[in-house]
């Protein structure tokens, strides 16, 4: 069923081509009723909004933003144009690649053409963005980068470190390894029980660092023998994008 994003001010409800739930729920690491809901979706804007002077790339909205942080009833919405998403996915952006493998809440014949060909967007070099994001989360976990997340201060007080950052570190390393070995990302994650345990603080910081280091090494080793191509076929992606947009616009009233 197509989610109603018009209620949040989205102007192109009829142009949606797919939607999925992201965040901790997609990974299988949601803690009961404590997390908000993260919606991700793609749309093809009208020609004037993609080819004209006022070009659109995304739409974001949140019902949260309160001092105490998002609660279980809050919703975060992040919608990308198909063109913007494809550019991110072709570069190996982890969040963008998730769209190809996440359980769908809504799909279309347009998106089916992309989800049926995930290999177009996969390459050996994509291990780098995953490890880069994991390293970023580790530095934030250790206080070496950025400011502390004031909304998660309770986690640090209770466990001695931000366990959500720790969960993302291990998740990203594991996804990088699976992507290199098998050309896919399983969602929810096969080790979701482990990820939940990490969020609950069942692992020490030292154990997180050791596990992260091990998984990073395994991901790099998997890259060396990966069956994936060295680079994505940008011409094939561009052709698929052009065909999909022209077909969608020819059938659309927008």
Predicted regions and their residues:
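Conserved NTP/Mg2+-binding pocket subregion across the NTase superfamily
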Residues: 63-176, 187, 197
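Intrinsically disordered, low-complexity regions
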Residues: 13, 152, 192-195
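Generic structural signal for hydrophobic core residues of well-folded globular domains
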Residues: 43, 89, 173-176, 180, ...
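Generic secondary-structure boundary/loop-capping signal
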Residues: 47-50, 56, 158, 182-184, ...
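A generic alpha-helix propensity feature with a strong bias for hydrophobic helices
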Residues: 48, 97, 121, 230-232
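Structured mid-to-C-terminal alpha-helical surface segments
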Residues: 125-127, 131-134, 138, 144, ...
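An N-terminal structural lobe/cap that precedes and organizes the functional/catalytic core
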Residues: 1-106
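Short, surface-exposed, charged/polar-biased interaction segments
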Residues: 40, 58-61, 103-106, 110, ...
